[in-house]
Amino acid sequence: IFGQIFRNARAIMYNSFEEQILINAVSDNAHVPSVIVGVGSKVPHHTAPERFRRKFKIDHPFIIYVGRVDANKGCKQLFEYFIRYVTNVSGKLSLVLIGNSVLPIPAHERIHHLGFTSDKDKFDGMAAAELLVIPSQYESLSMATLEAWGLGRPVLANGHCDVLKGQCLRSNAGLYYDNYEEFAEALHALETSSPLRKGLGHNGRRFFS
């Protein structure tokens, strides 16, 4: 049914190159006129990262996840990877989660679930974080990724998601992983290298704009 719809459309607007490639492959509709339009996104000109730290009593450097806390979003694997990382590689980082949860969250001193927050808290949290982590395999376009780049923060993404991987490669503003070993190596590189974080973050701002 959907294949016929995509083949008979007069024109199609796609959110990303990877989305276009997928639809072309499954629908055989490369003949249909199309354009990559992305989606509009705004971030504040000024943020208050220290206000966020004081409000939520977070003293350690942290990485942040923004979105529904759900196994389908890769959060169960993220918990496993992160706990393994802070146990065996580096115990300095915390993981901050912003968003409603439909998944049990491990009771761990370095995992902080803030629930649903205001946009101000969300953006201040992103600005305070070392990086944004996106563990989902299934994204057609990640708004949180674009927002993080708009704020000059690098991204660590699930490399099994073609869209996220493609965005990281085109922007040169993020790293990606396919397994725990790559997750740990990429996270350790980002955690320990301020020049790397700043360089990727700078590229992210440029890509966002």
Where in this protein do the model-derived segments appear?
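Conserved acidic donor-binding segment of nucleotide-sugar-dependent glycosyltransferases
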Residues: 116, 174-181, 189-194
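Acidic anion/phosphate-binding donor-loop and adjacent secondary structure
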Residues: 24, 38-55
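Short hydrophobic beta-strand element within catalytic cores of glycosyltransferases
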Residues: 154-158
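Membrane-proximal helix-turn-helix segments that form the acceptor-binding/catalytic region
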Residues: 1-12
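Conserved donor-binding/catalytic core segment of Leloir-type glycosyltransferases
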Residues: 13, 56-73, 79-83
